[in-house]
Regions:
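C-terminal substrate/ligand-recognition segments
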Residues: 113-121
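Conserved kinase catalytic-core segment
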Residues: 1-103, 107, 121-124
Length: 126
């Protein structure tokens, strides 16, 4: 249910997840240009919130060996390590450059969460 809700920009993600922690997880991975984020190196913790409801929480970030400018390739293209062009990244940079279609990877949970209306509203307040 959480994954299906994350795939819809207008879904009520707060039923399944702590929106603030999802927004923080998205922002720190986007700002850190974490290449692995959302595909293989992201964790969510399932625990009780302050109201006693069980929800998914964005967990601490990890696996930053390919982040912060250390990788510029795609998939397993190991010959493209080292940043050559910061504009090739997806997420906020593509939206800033009005090229959102490049970030439409439906298997990337962080890309899905980044398009959620609730997460975008929460991100402004962080």
């Amino acid at each position: 249910a959480f994954y299906r809700a994350a795939k819809k920009a207008d879904s009520d993600l707060s039923q399944y997840a702590d929106v603030d922690s999802c927004a923080k997880l998205w922002l720190i991975n986007e700002l850190g240009k974490n290449w692995d984020s959302g595909v293989s190196s992201v964790y969510f913790v399932y625990k009780q919130d302050s109201d006693g409801n069980y929800k998914f929480f964005g967990s601490p970030v990890w696996d930053y060996d390919n982040a912060l400018g250390n990788a510029a390739g795609s998939a397993w293209d190991l010959q493209n390590f080292g940043v050559k062009d910061y504009t090739q990244y997806s997420g906020w940079w593509c939206r800033f450059k009005d090229r959102q279609k490049r970030s439409q990877n439906s298997s990337n949970i962080i890309n899905n969460i980044s398009r959620n209306t609730q997460v975008n509203k929460a991100a402004v307040n962080i």
